[in-house]
Amino acid sequence: MESPIRFENVDINQILKTLPHRFPFLLIDRVINIREDYSGIGVKNVSFNEPCFQGHFPDRPVFPGVLMIEGMAQTAGVIGIMSVTGTEKPRAVYFLTIDKCKFRKPVLPGDTIEYHMKSIGRRKAMWWFHGDAKVNGVVVAEADVGAMLTD
């Protein structure tokens, strides 16, 4: 049974209030279904207009895997920051670790990536998440990421 939803739809305006990232390095468009078990789904609509496609690769554009990992981390950051309540609400998130990273299929312009993130551990201000990046329900990348929430 799935955990209850705390935040159904975090739009770009709320993401901008939550994360310090801005263009061209804000790599999620919204986060949906943030649950009480600290899971949620980040959504990224990949456009041919992304700056990375100028060099990756001009004749066959492929969304860089490292940017998918960053998208996972940003999704985890939104989940973590929005899940903390009270006076100790963090204002920043710092990427700490990447483990068990695998790239399975290329992501192309026109694809929509869903970053399915679930907390796998927490110690004080440090959080760890497992993420599966999916396009049309197919896993295209996966990784465990760690981050520290701070003010």
Curated annotation (Swiss-Prot):
Domain of life of the source: Bacteria
Claim: Cytoplasm is one of the keywords in the record: yes
Keywords, ordered alphabetically: Cytoplasm, Lipid A biosynthesis, Lipid biosynthesis, Lipid metabolism, Lyase
Pfam families: FabA
Localization per Swiss-Prot or TrEMBL: Cytoplasm
rRNA-binding found in the keyword field: no
Catalyzed chemical reaction(s): a (3R)-hydroxyacyl-[ACP] = a (2E)-enoyl-[ACP] + H2O
Main location: cytoplasm
EC number(s) reported in the record: 4.2.1.59
GO molecular function terms noted in the UniProt entry: (3R)-hydroxyacyl-[acyl-carrier-protein] dehydratase activity
BP GO terms, sorted: fatty acid biosynthetic process; lipid A biosynthetic process
Gene3D superfamilies reported for this sequence: Hotdog Thioesterase (3.10.129.10)
Active site: 56
Cellular compartments per GO CC: cytoplasm; membrane
Role played: Involved in unsaturated fatty acids biosynthesis. Catalyzes the dehydration of short chain beta-hydroxyacyl-ACPs and long chain saturated and unsaturated beta-hydroxyacyl-ACPs.
PANTHER family, sorted: 3-HYDROXYACYL-[ACYL-CARRIER-PROTEIN] DEHYDRATASE
Family indicated by similarity: Belongs to the thioester dehydratase family. FabZ subfamily.
Protein name per the record: 3-hydroxyacyl-[acyl-carrier-protein] dehydratase FabZ
Species this chain originates from: Rhodopseudomonas palustris (strain BisA53)
Taxonomic placement: Bacteria, Pseudomonadati, Pseudomonadota, Alphaproteobacteria, Hyphomicrobiales
